[in-house]
């Protein structure tokens, strides 16, 4: 089979490495891919949002199956365009990808169908939002309606911060048209959990849970990033909580999308808060998370391509989706300065992958015979083990074997999970 993967980050590298385990896969193309992915797939310099060029390439190469990984092409209708040419795809159509593409849509969906989430208000005018904030409880959460590279959510701990966030989104157009509507919602407390789920539009098969570390610096200090590391499973996410989430969140969400005429097929990401009142949805994503994918897929024992094809064909009920009982840890190596200004072009020397350790390449390109940094988040250094403490230790040992002079990591990925295990 010839497989096409749209995207070019660490998440896509993890997907490609897993797809390669299927013996029927003869060739994988990555559009655009990156310098590290080039070891595992044929990279083609076509942008992930250039849907006409992606479709032309897929037709020309007679692609048997496509995986559209990033949010932008999903929201823009890449799956619709490929399906129209008879190419089966893993990923939702545009009318279902709106569950991530519009925070207003997703909040209204949850309200309509009784799916637990934070209380909220929607605003299209900055002055009305600012007037509302004068009496809103603080801290509060301000969200841009549209896609904003994972940076469109501000937790404001003072009224001044909240007003500033509204002005930057709605008046200064920090996120372009994505901030022309905003959601202001109640600040929830409790442990956060990420759960990715395979779905064919009816059946839901949750993956192993994970814990993200979004802040740039140790002890959850600094600004929000796309994610500085992950561990799986998340010790706060017990079997009992998993059952509650399946009954009150996962299945109702998929049923709600069907009822709205927007059947969702692909990977549905649930960002959850385990509040004193029970699990609530913080956000939905219409695709695999990054870097959650880098810990979840190494623990998948079932064949990824088979599961993806079942999601696309509506036959997920017939497929066994199994995960190992082990643990995984991914430590992101970023360019110094990320998520602010950083330098690119720093040479990278990486250890070889082995049975329990891998490096997923995100922001890097080939230069001459080697790799150099070419982004903020550069590498996802991952290890798997029978237990979480060992996985964390192995991941940091592997970080120590990477030559990346301009790289930095958080030193405490997994520390919160370890505390939870000790309770």
Residues covered by each model-derived region:
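Solvent-exposed alpha-helices and their adjacent loops that cap or buttress functional pockets
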Residues: 21, 36-38, 90, 112-114, ...
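Active-site "cap" helix and flanking loop/linker of ATP-utilizing ligase/carboxylase catalytic domains
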Residues: 246-268, 285-354, 366-367
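Generic C-terminus detector
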Residues: 364-368, 373-423
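Short, charged, surface-exposed secondary-structure boundary motifs
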Residues: 38-41, 55, 98-104, 217-218
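Active-site nucleotide/adenylate-binding loops and adjacent lid/helix of ATP-dependent enzymes
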Residues: 4-5, 100-181, 235, 239-251
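ATP-binding N-terminal substructure of ATP-dependent carboxylate-amine bond-forming enzymes
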Residues: 1-94
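Internal nucleotide-binding/catalytic subdomain
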Residues: 152, 156-293
């Amino acid at each position: 089979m010839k497989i096409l993967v749209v995207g070019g980050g660490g998440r896509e590298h993890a997907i490609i490495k897993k797809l390669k385990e299927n013996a029927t896969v003869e060739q994988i193309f990555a559009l655009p891919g990156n310098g590290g992915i080039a070891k595992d797939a044929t990279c083609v310099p076509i942008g992930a949002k250039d849907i006409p060029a992606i479709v032309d390439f897929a037709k020309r190469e007679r692609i048997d199956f496509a995986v559209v990984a990033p949010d932008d092409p999903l929201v823009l209708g890449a799956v619709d365009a490929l399906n129209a040419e008879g190419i089966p795809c893993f990923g939702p159509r545009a009318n279902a990808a709106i569950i991530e593409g519009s925070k207003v849509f997703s909040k209204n969906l949850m309200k309509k169908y009784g799916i637990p989430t934070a209380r909220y208000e929607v605003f299209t005018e900055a002055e009305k939002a600012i007037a509302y904030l004068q009496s809103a409880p603080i801290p509060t959460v301000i969200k841009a309606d549209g896609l904003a590279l994972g940076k469109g959510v501000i937790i404001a701990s003072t009224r001044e911060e909240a007003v500033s966030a509204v002005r930057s989104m709605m008046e200064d157009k920090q996120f372009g048209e994505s901030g022309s509507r905003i959601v202001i919602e109640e600040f929830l407390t409790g442990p956060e959990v990420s759960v990715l789920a395979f779905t064919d539009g009816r059946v839901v098969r949750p993956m192993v849970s994970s814990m993200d570390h979004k802040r740039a610096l140790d002890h959850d200090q600094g600004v929000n990033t796309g994610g500085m590391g992950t561990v799986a499973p998340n010790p706060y996410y017990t079997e009992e909580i998993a059952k509650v989430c399946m009954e009150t969140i996962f299945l109702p969400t998929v049923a709600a999308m069907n009822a709205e005429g927007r059947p969702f097929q692909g990977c549905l990401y649930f960002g959850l808060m385990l509040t004193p009142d029970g699990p609530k949805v913080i956000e939905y994503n219409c695709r695999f998370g990054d870097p959650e994918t880098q810990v979840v897929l190494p623990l998948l024992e079932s064949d990824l391509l088979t599961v993806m094809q079942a999601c696309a064909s509506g036959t997920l009920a017939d497929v066994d989706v199994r995960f190992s009982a082990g643990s995984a840890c991914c430590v992101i190596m970023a360019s110094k300065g990320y998520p602010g200004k950083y330098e690119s072009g720093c040479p990278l020397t990486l250890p070889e992958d082995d049975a329990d350790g891998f490096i997923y390449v995100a922001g890097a390109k080939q230069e001459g015979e080697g790799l150099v940094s070419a982004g903020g988040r550069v590498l996802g250094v991952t290890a798997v083990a029978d237990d979480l403490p060992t996985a964390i230790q192995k991941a940091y040992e592997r970080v120590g074997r990477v030559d990346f002079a301009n790289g930095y990591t958080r030193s405490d990925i997994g520390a919160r999970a370890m505390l939870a295990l000790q309770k």
